[in-house]
Amino acid sequence: MPTVALDTRDAFVPMPHGSGIYTRRLAGALRSTAGSDGLDYWFLERGGRAPELWWEQVTLPRLLRRRRPALVHTPNCFLPLRRPCPGVVTVHDLAFEAHRDDFSRRTGWKYRTITRRAARSAERVICVSNFTRDDVCARYGVDRDRTRVVPNAPALPAGSAMPPAGRYLLYAGDLRPKKNLLRMVRAWRRLRREGLEQRLVLAGRDFGVGAELRAAAGNEPLEMPGFVDDIGLDALMRGADALVHPSLYEGFGMAVVEAMVRGCPTVLARATALPETGGDAAAYFEPRDEDDIARAIRAVLDDPARRAELIKRGERRAAELSWKRTAAATVEVYRELL
């Protein structure tokens, strides 16, 4: 039975996000089908104290040569350039190319260099959206025939914690410049002055923009609780009047489908992968136009029939996505190389 080596080192960090959540859910789904799908799996975890780059490009290839799996899949963009078997790499987005100021010089250089080389050398490149696929092919000159689109799926476990009291709008994700939160806060403040009841909750780690956002909010009720665990995020989404996602760049937009699962209408930027993820189940705005952001939020909140329709469509859209389906599509990519 062929063995697939899966790099799972990002899955079990204390606060996983992005590729770590993807890896954890994919590994769980693959583990449940191991053997019955005709494949065995070797879940690799990083050990020791070697620098990350050394582990990726030296230690991991040694492990692969020792055990000789049929192929290796790295779900985090980082694929060993020298390997004894075919390689599959998942690319979630190229934000480090499109928004370089969001990354330190060292981190940005690492992601750009390793991801470019991995995408060009991999036998298959899995992209989480058609947008990311187009971006990878355009920026790195990757042959489209070597790419496959396999979308993400909702990953948050369902919980029963009580949502916060009162009415609020929610943003869930990192607080970074590319997330376009300043324009959203300004639009929300304008709505508050016009009588909007909802406060604004920005749930996520602050990467240097928090002070500016607080200043833009003035005396209006802006909450920034920082990193929120799965239980807390589930409760926040169930209680929100709407999820607003103003980002200028997303490779998929996990928060969108998480909100849809929980009956929370979504109001999204018409940018990058968000329209692909939201489809006809979301309301949209032009992300650089504060007036349009305010208009879209108000339109959803003031029209109960429209809001109910978005909730219904969102639940239907989210039901199309599951980790069982994502794993099955990923296995089909593996089979192309076996």
Where is each model-derived feature located?
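Carbohydrate transferase catalytic cores enriched for Leloir-type hexosyltransferases
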Residues: 1-338
